[in-house]
Amino acid sequence: MARKIIYWISTVIVAGSLLAALTYLTGNEQVVSGFNKAGYPQTLRIVLGIAKPAAAIVLLLPGLALLKEWAYAGAAIAWGMALITHYTGGDGPKVWGMVLMLLVLLVVSYVTRPSSRRLTPVSPSVAVQAKQWMGSDSKP
């Protein structure tokens, strides 16, 4: 039960932060200047303004295991780059610490997610059949 509570708390916080990226689409002066300061093109702001909220929705919906893997990976890459950008840009720990906290919550959400929200691994027999079909098991 505790694992389920930890999962939902971390996931809701992560999803809320990802949904907040909708502000990237408004052309908010603070967001635009932040992307400019980092040297990133404004088109990245638009892409993230669409991708992050989409990831939030996928994380909250049941099923969609493969899309969830992509959502977790995309959020990790985006926040990893944000962490590096803020740290190397001279922003203080108040700024990059928040991004680091979101990355930790993302990992907690990923690790504690229920089996119904995980990608089912390929069975070994399928992998063996694929190797045989591709000819990698053939003897010289």
Provide a role label for each language-model segment:
Residues 1-140:
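Membrane-interface extramembranous regions
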